[in-house]
C-alpha cells in the first residue's frame, strides 16, 4: 500500500512539475505591437500594409499549422479567380422589370483593381517576385444556353458597357466564334443549341498561396517580425490598459506562452469566429457561422489542359444559390497548368479543412443559436440544395461536367476536396437571423482587436478589405498626412473611384499589367448585339447565397 501511495505521490509531483513548467513558460510574456493570428493572405496583407505605414512597429504572426498558406489561401483550396465580375453572373442580378443591376459588379471590379495595384506596388518594392509565379492572364468568359439565359446575357453585356471598368468585353452568339474562344466547351455540342458568351481578355488566374508565402517571407526579413508556426491560440484576455494577453500553445512541445499585444487581428479563416467569441467583446454576440465545403473535378491530362485557356462561368440553376454557379477553369498552380470544374458543395461540421468536427457545435452559443435556427427555417431551398449536393454520385458530377465539356472522359478527371468556407450568420432585428454573403470586419469600440469573418469574394479582395480594416481601426492615423501619402503610394487610386473615368481606368490597368506581366490592349469598340428583350421576371423566392 505504501508503495502504491508513494508511486501516486511521485506521479502527482511529476504532473504538478509539468503543469508548473507550462505555467512558468506561459508567464514568460512576449510583447508586440501587432499580433496577427493566422498565416493566410489576410494577415499577410495587413502585415505588409503596416510594415510600410509603421516600419518601427513590432509584429508577431502565429499559425496553427506547420506552414503558412495551408488552409483557404492554398492554391488547391480555392478557385484561384481574380474576382472582378467580368464573368460571374451572380454579381449582376436581374430586376423584376428585366433590367440588369450592375452596382455590385462595379464594386467588385473596383475592389480587384485595388488588389492589382497593391500587388504591383509590392513587385516594384521587391516584396513580391516573379509575377508569373502568382498571377497569369487567363481570359474570363460567361457562357449560357437557352433562350431566356441568352437574353439575360445580352442584357448584362449591354448594361456593363455603361462602366469604364468593363470596356473591352466581347459578346457572341456564334458557335464558331465561341469555339475559337473556348474549343473544349463547344466541341461535341448540338449545333442547334442556342448559346451565348462574353469574353474579357484581361481576366486573371491567381495563386493566393504563393502571394501569401512571398509576403510573409519578406516580413520575416525584418528583425521586429516574428513568425511562430505550430502555435495555437488558446485564450484572449483584455487587460486594464486595453492591451490583450493572448495565450499561445506550442503544439510540438506542449508548452504555452503569453503574448501581450496592443492590437490583435484575427485572420484565421474559419477559426476566426471561435476566436472572436473567445475574446468576449460584445460585438461577437451578433454572429454565428455555418460551414460549407467545396469539391472540384481536376484534370492534368495535357490533351485537356492544352485545349482550354479560359475561366468559363455559367449561370446557377433555379433554386440554387447564385454563387454556386458551375465553372470550368484554367489554373496555373506551382508553374503547372491544370483544369478544374466545379464547385460541388460538401458538408462537414469542421470550420477548417484541418479543423475539428466539434467546430460548429463549440461555436454555437445562447446568443447565436436563435439566429441560426431562423436562417435554417427561412432558407429551406438552400437546405434542399446542400442535401442534393451531398447526395451527388460520381456519375452525377460527371454529367454536370459534360454540360460544359461535352466530350469529357471520366478517366481524365479526379475529385479534389478544396477548403471550408464558413458562411456568416448575423442577428437581424426583423428576421431573427440572416445569411450574409461576403466578408465583414468585426472590431471592438476601442479599435484594439478586429476579426475578418466570411468567405467571398475573399482573397481576391484582400487588399481593399484590409484597407477597410485600417480605416475602421486606425481611423485617426489613416487621416494623417503621413499615412495618406503612403497609402496613395501603395494604391494610386486610393480615395477615388475608377468607374466612370475612362482615362484613369486605362492608366491603372496599363500600369498594373506592365508590372505584373499581364496582357492588356486598349479596348476596341463594343460588339453589336441583338437588342435584349426586357421581360418582366416571374416572382421567385430568393435563395440565400453562399460561398463555395
UniProtKB/Swiss-Prot annotation:
Region (Disordered): 521-548
SUPFAM superfamilies: FAD/NAD(P)-binding domain (SSF51905)
Cross-referenced NCBIfam families: mal_quin_oxido, PRK05257.1-1, PRK05257.1-4, PRK05257.2-1, PRK05257.2-4, PRK05257.3-2, PRK13339.1
EC class of the enzyme, as a word: oxidoreductase
Descriptive protein name: Probable malate:quinone oxidoreductase
Gene from which the chain derives: mqo
Family annotation (Pfam families): Mqo
This protein's record includes keyword Nucleotidyltransferase: no
Pathway: Carbohydrate metabolism; tricarboxylic acid cycle; oxaloacetate from (S)-malate (quinone route): step 1/1
Names of required cofactors: FAD
UniProt GO MF annotations: 2-hydroxyglutarate dehydrogenase activity; L-malate dehydrogenase (quinone) activity
HAMAP family for the chain: MQO (MF_00212)
GO BP annotation list: tricarboxylic acid cycle
Comp. bias intervals (Low complexity): 530-541
Reactions the enzyme catalyzes: (S)-malate + a quinone = a quinol + oxaloacetate
This enzyme's EC code(s): 1.1.5.4
PANTHER family: L-2-HYDROXYGLUTARATE DEHYDROGENASE, MITOCHONDRIAL (PTHR43104:SF2)
